[in-house]
């Protein structure tokens, strides 16, 4: 056990040559405020005057005080005492006043004479038969107010220095507090509590007990009743200023201290646990037991540090040989290792991979599957294309002719415009992968490569040029992929929604919209009927008044209903199409409600209606079915099917058949004698192009009626059908200005109004665009990552080593490339010195065989 403290002293000497304590050696740290008597306690422990004295801050650097006990000579002769400084290893100071002067000189050398402080410690060894084996660290006293040229933050500097020592878990804290101050205001105890809140490694020292006011004592503090500490409190008596002036020796003051505690009426009960001698023995035991408990961990730490430093030294390598052969072999070895690490980083085979984030090839996979794929999926197939753009493209594609079908060239133009949008994110994906490969190169930091600054810079330059060279064909391939998709629009692709599928989809969609609208009209009518019935009941009109005023109410109701139907027909394109279809084709015009018809007659059969009229198309059919209703329904269904296909295929503009093949019915809806309204035509059928299949007489009547209506419409300006809307738009231009034509505008845009046919065609193009663009997106998402991997990533992996050898393996470059940096040479020397120190420390620790005794 007696050898433990000298062992720690040797370890401190060994590590102090490095200027640091990497092992956190066990030590005792003395902390106290300025003028707390801290230095006097240390002098009492040593038994000699050797510390600087004066006003203000005196201790301005940490003092590591190593006390070594010398045995007394057998003949009883006096044994010499001396001190040694680590910065003067060959000088022995027998005069302790010279030790004081050397402390002042070395402090001024480091901090100057302006009362500044420094964290660089002073190591002092004192050999004496009057001391116990002990190691203490005396820190500067905590001050509040700067003195002289001290910086304004002197208090914070001292606190940081103190905390750096006492926060170590192997440090025993000696908190010095004068007895004539309030213990609650003790700076030493406050700092100790911050790092040792439970007080397990803090021992309190109460100084200046003899200077307390008469009638007061520190018994409560010394017994631990005020602030409990595991190691307790010890009281000591310091020399007074009068004793110092009288040159009273420390040994005499120690004797006076013993007598003080024995004769004091209160402290005599704890005299055997008070005084400087008891403090020295207590600290000696605490330090020895503390060293004993921490010694096994110290051995493990020393062994681990030795292994780590040896591994670090191996990365710096040995000094280079002068021969060209050895330099060339070393260069090839470094290139091979770097190339292998580059490939392994991409393939995920690198051993020292990070566990906290994605690295290397995993980041490239993230770019493909998360960033690029997500971006392509979010591209809207119809973004940047409005309905007007689609209609304008279709009209431009037909030229001066009216096409029978939707021009396919318009679909191809719109598809190509959208496919080109995939080129930018694909090219950006190439840049992302290129940057990621550069990131891998910069992060590799091969240990063998870090020795040579010039070689490292040239390797990175060559690899970046290689990546840049392979990036060019990669981007070219991406451009070709987009051009391939735009070169041929494969409408025969199995995944393309074309042909009957798209027609059926749009037809069902159109039917659903029309049914929903008719259902809304029916609901509105029923709601109106209920409101009228409730209003009649609330008015309490008698039967006579009902008889007199009934017809007027019914007429008013019928007029309101007709207005509502006309408004719905004018605002709803589907209802217009239905009404126009019934007027175009045989089967009779839409039925109109008679002025004197009662509301309850709407639900009865056709016997209550005139012979050539049917029920209004906008009024719900709630009555039982009859032949007329069936005929009307069949005609309506036939017309719906015909209008669907006629919206896709263009018929010839025969004047007798309207604008696109349907019979022109202007001014015939109210003509009961018109051939279109005759019941004999209710059974006629129509082909899919909107043409009429009927007898010759009916065809002639229809043609004559249509021609007369076509001529009359010029003067009457009455166009109930949407097929004549284009004629109305330019009527004034041709007939209102004589024989002069308007000037042709420099820019002609498609009209804003869309006919039902144009709506159908644009909707068809939109559906086809979405279907085909999704096919292209799927192809591009698959082809772009494959192209990048082949042309950029894999090509770089295969050619990196050959490229480095071809560019760098030249004898005239060996000296330049293999020149070591000064930092590497300095680190190699530091590692060798650390290895030597750790080996000595390991030998010192191994000197203690049985440290448990």
Swiss-Prot record:
GO terms for biological process: actin filament organization; endosome organization; establishment or maintenance of cell polarity; intracellular distribution of mitochondria; midbody abscission; mitochondrial fission; mitochondrion organization; nucleus organization. Residues 22-296 form the Dynamin-type G domain. SMART domains: DYNc, GED. One of its GO terms (cellular component) is cleavage furrow. It comes from the Eukaryota. Residues 58-60 are annotated as: G2 motif. Residues 523-738 are annotated as: Disordered. Residues 138-141 are annotated as: G3 motif. Pfam families: Dynamin_M (PF01031), Dynamin_N (PF00350), GED (PF02212). GTP binds at residues 32-40, 207-213, 238-241. One of its GO terms (molecular function) is GTPase activity. Residues 32-39 are annotated as: G1 motif. Residues 207-210 are annotated as: G4 motif. Keywords: Cytoplasm, GTP-binding, Hydrolase, Motor protein, Nucleotide-binding. Residues 237-240 are annotated as: G5 motif. The keyword Repeat does not apply. Residues 523-569, 590-607, 625-635, 664-728 have a biased composition (Low complexity). Residues 610-624 have a biased composition (Polar residues). Residues 762-853 form the GED domain. Its main location: cytoplasm. It is found in: Cytoplasm. The keyword Transferase does not apply. Belongs to the TRAFAC class dynamin-like GTPase superfamily. Dynamin/Fzo/YdjA family. Function in membrane trafficking processes along the endo-lysosomal pathway. This is Dynamin-A. It comes from Dictyostelium discoideum (Social amoeba). The lineage of its organism: Eukaryota, Amoebozoa, Evosea, Eumycetozoa, Dictyostelia.
């Amino acid at each position: 056990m007696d050898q433990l403290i000298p062992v720690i002293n040797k370890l401190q000497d060994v590590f102090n040559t490095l200027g640091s304590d990497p092992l956190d050696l066990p030590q005792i740290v003395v902390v106290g405020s300025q003028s707390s008597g801290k230095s006097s306690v240390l002098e009492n422990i040593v038994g000699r005057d050797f510390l600087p004295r004066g006003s203000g801050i005196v201790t301005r650097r940490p003092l590591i005080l190593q006390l070594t006990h010398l045995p007394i000579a057998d003949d009883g002769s006096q044994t010499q005492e001396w001190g040694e400084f680590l910065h003067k290893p060959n000088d022995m100071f027998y005069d302790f006043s010279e030790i004081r002067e050397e402390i002042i000189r070395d402090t001024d050398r480091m901090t100057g004479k302006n009362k500044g402080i420094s964290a660089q410690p002073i190591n002092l060894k004192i050999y004496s038969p009057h001391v116990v084996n002990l190691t203490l660290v005396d820190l500067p006293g905590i001050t509040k107010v700067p003195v002289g040229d001290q910086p304004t933050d002197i208090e914070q500097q001292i606190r940081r220095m103190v905390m750096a020592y006492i926060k170590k878990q192997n440090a025993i804290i000696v908190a010095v507090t004068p007895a004539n101050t309030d213990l609650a205001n003790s700076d030493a105890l406050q700092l100790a509590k911050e790092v040792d809140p439970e007080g397990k490694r803090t021992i309190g020292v109460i100084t200046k007990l003899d200077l307390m006011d008469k009638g007061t004592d520190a018994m409560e503090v010394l017994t631990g009743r005020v602030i409990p500490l595991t190691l307790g409190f010890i009281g000591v008596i310091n020399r007074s200023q009068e004793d110092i002036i009288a040159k009273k020796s420390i040994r005499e003051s120690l004797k006076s201290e013993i007598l003080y505690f024995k004769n004091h009426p209160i402290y005599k009960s704890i005299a055997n646990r008070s005084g400087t001698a008891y403090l020295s023995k207590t600290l000696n035991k605490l330090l020895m037991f503390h060293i004993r408990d921490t010694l096994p961990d110290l051995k493990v730490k020393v062994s681990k540090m030795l292994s780590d430093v040896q591994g670090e030294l191996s990365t710096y390598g040995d000094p280079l040989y002068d021969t060209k052969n050895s330099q060339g072999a070393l260069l090839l070895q470094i290139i091979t290792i770097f190339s292998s690490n580059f490939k392994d980083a991409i393939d995920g085979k690198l051993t020292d991979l990070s566990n906290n984030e994605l690295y290397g090839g995993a980041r490239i996979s993230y770019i493909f599957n998360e960033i690029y794929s997500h971006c392509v999926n979010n591209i809207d197939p119809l973004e940047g294309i409005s309905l007007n753009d689609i209609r304008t493209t279709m009209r431009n594609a037909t030229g001066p002719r009216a096409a029978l079908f939707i021009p396919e060239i318009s679909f191809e133009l719109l598809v190509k415009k959208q496919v080109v949008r995939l080129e930018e994110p694909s090219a950006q994906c190439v840049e992302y992968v290129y940057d990621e490969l550069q990131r891998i190169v910069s992060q590799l930091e091969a240990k063998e490569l870090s020795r040579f600054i010039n070689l490292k810079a040239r390797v990175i330059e060559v690899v970046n040029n290689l990546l840049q060279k392979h990036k060019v064909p990669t981007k070219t391939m991406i451009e070709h992929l987009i051009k391939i998709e735009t070169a041929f629009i494969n409408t025969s692709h199995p995944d393309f929604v074309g042909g009957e599928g798209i027609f059926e989809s749009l037809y069902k969609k159109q039917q659903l919209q029309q049914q929903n609208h008719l259902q809304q009209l029916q609901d509105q009518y029923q709601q109106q009927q209920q409101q009228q019935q409730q209003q009649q009941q609330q008015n309490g009109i008698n039967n006579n008044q009902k008889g007199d005023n009934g017809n007027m109410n019914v007429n008013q109701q019928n007029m309101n209903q007709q207005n509502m139907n006309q408004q719905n027909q004018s605002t709803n394109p589907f209802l217009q199409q239905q009404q126009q279809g019934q007027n175009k084709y045989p089967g009779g015009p839409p039925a109109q409600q008679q002025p004197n018809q009662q509301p309850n007659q709407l639900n009865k059969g056709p016997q209550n209606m005139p012979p050539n009229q049917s029920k209004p198309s906008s009024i719900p059919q709630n009555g039982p079915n009859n032949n007329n209703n069936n005929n009307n329904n069949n005609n309506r269904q036939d017309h719906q099917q015909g209008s669907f296909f006629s919206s896709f295929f263009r018929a010839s503009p025969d004047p007798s058949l309207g604008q696109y093949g349907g019979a022109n019915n202007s001014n015939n809806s109210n003509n009961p004698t018109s051939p279109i309204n005759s019941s004999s035509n209710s059974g006629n059928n129509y082909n899919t192009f909107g043409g009429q299949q009927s007898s010759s007489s009916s065809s002639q009547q229809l043609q004559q009626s249509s021609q007369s209506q076509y001529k009359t419409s010029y003067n009457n300006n009455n166009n109930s059908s949407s097929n004549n809307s284009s004629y109305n738009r330019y009527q004034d231009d041709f007939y209102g200005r004589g024989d002069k034509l308007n000037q042709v505008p420099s820019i002609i845009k498609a009209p804003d109004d869309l006919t039902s046919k144009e709506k159908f065609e644009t909707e068809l193009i939109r559906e086809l665009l979405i279907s085909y663009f999704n096919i292209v997106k799927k192809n591009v998402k698959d082809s772009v990552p494959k192209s990048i991997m082949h042309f950029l990533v894999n090509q770089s992996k295969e050619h990196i080593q050959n490229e480095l050898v071809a560019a760098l393996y030249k004898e005239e470059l060996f000296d330049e490339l293999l020149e070591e940096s000064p930092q590497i040479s300095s680190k190699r020397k530091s590692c060798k010195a650390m290895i030597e120190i750790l080996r000595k420390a390991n030998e010192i620790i191994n000197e203690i065989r049985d440290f448990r005794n």
